[in-house]
Amino acid sequence: MSSRRSRSRQSGSSRITDEQISDLVSKLQDLLPEARLRSNDRVPSSRVLQETCNYIRSLHQEVDDLSERLSELLATSDMSSAQAAIIRSLLM
């Protein structure tokens, strides 16, 4: 028997219900900044999940962009290397 089946049988009592999934999707939807997803209309779970993935990707891109800008600023600033090292250590 595969370990996946074993785990599935062992955790049978802890399976997530459709209601719990719906609640989690609703919570995800509340976290999304998209105004169009905030309507009271029922939005398909697949759309909420897709929008969540898109939002996470955009956040990753924003972090990358800000990190690059910060690196450029640190490289051109007049601060001492000790000060720059402190700032870098705080950011990592």
Curated annotation (Swiss-Prot):
<dbReference type="Pfam" id="PF23174">
    <property type="entry name" value="bHLH_ILI"/>
</dbReference>
<dbReference type="GO" id="GO:0006355">
    <property type="term" value="P:regulation of DNA-templated transcription"/>
</dbReference>
<keyword id="KW-0539">Nucleus</keyword>
<comment type="function">
    <text>Atypical and probable non DNA-binding bHLH transcription factor that acts as a positive regulator of grain size. Binds the transcription repressor APG and forms a heterodimer of antagonistic bHLH transcription factors that regulates grain length and weight by controlling cell elongation in lemma and palea. May be involved in the control of lamina inclination through brassinosteroid signaling pathway.</text>
</comment>
<comment type="subunit">
    <text>Interacts with APG.</text>
</comment>
<protein>
    <recommendedName>
        <fullName>Transcription factor ILI6</fullName>
    </recommendedName>
</protein>
<keyword id="KW-0804">Transcription</keyword>
<dbReference type="GO" id="GO:0009742">
    <property type="term" value="P:brassinosteroid mediated signaling pathway"/>
</dbReference>
<dbReference type="GO" id="GO:0046983">
    <property type="term" value="F:protein dimerization activity"/>
</dbReference>
<dbReference type="InterPro" id="IPR036638">
    <property type="entry name" value="HLH_DNA-bd_sf"/>
</dbReference>
<keyword id="KW-0805">Transcription regulation</keyword>
<feature type="region of interest" description="Disordered">
    <location>
        <begin position="1"/>
        <end position="20"/>
    </location>
</feature>
<comment type="similarity">
    <text>Belongs to the bHLH protein family.</text>
</comment>
<keyword id="KW-1070">Brassinosteroid signaling pathway</keyword>
<dbReference type="InterPro" id="IPR044293">
    <property type="entry name" value="PRE"/>
</dbReference>
<dbReference type="InterPro" id="IPR011598">
    <property type="entry name" value="bHLH_dom"/>
</dbReference>
<feature type="domain" description="bHLH">
    <location>
        <begin position="5"/>
        <end position="59"/>
    </location>
</feature>
<dbReference type="GO" id="GO:0080113">
    <property type="term" value="P:regulation of seed growth"/>
</dbReference>
<keyword id="KW-0341">Growth regulation</keyword>
<dbReference type="GO" id="GO:0005634">
    <property type="term" value="C:nucleus"/>
</dbReference>
